[in-house]
From Swiss-Prot:
An individual GO BP term: polysaccharide catabolic process
Top-level division of the source organism's lineage: Bacteria
Protein's UniProt name: Chitinase
EC number: 3.2.1.14
pH dependence (record): Optimum pH is 6-8. There is a 37.7% decrease in activity at pH 5 and a 39.8% decrease in activity at pH 9.
Keyword DNA repair attached: no
Activity regulation as described: Inhibited by divalent metal ions. Maximum inhibition observed with Ca(2+) while the least inhibition was observed with Fe(2+). Inhibited by high concentrations of GlcNAc.
Key words of the record: Antimicrobial, Carbohydrate metabolism, Chitin degradation, Chitin-binding, Fungicide, Glycosidase, Hydrolase, Polysaccharide degradation
Temperature dependence as stated in the record: Optimum temperature is 35 degrees Celsius.
Family: Belongs to the glycosyl hydrolase 18 family. Chitinase class II subfamily.
Biological function: Antifungal activity. Inhibits the mycelial growth of A.niger, A.alternata and H.sativum.
Amino acid sequence: EQPGGDKVNLGYFTN
């Protein structure tokens, strides 16, 4: 959901 996040949800967009 949030690109460049830090495992915001389940690590979908973990940068």
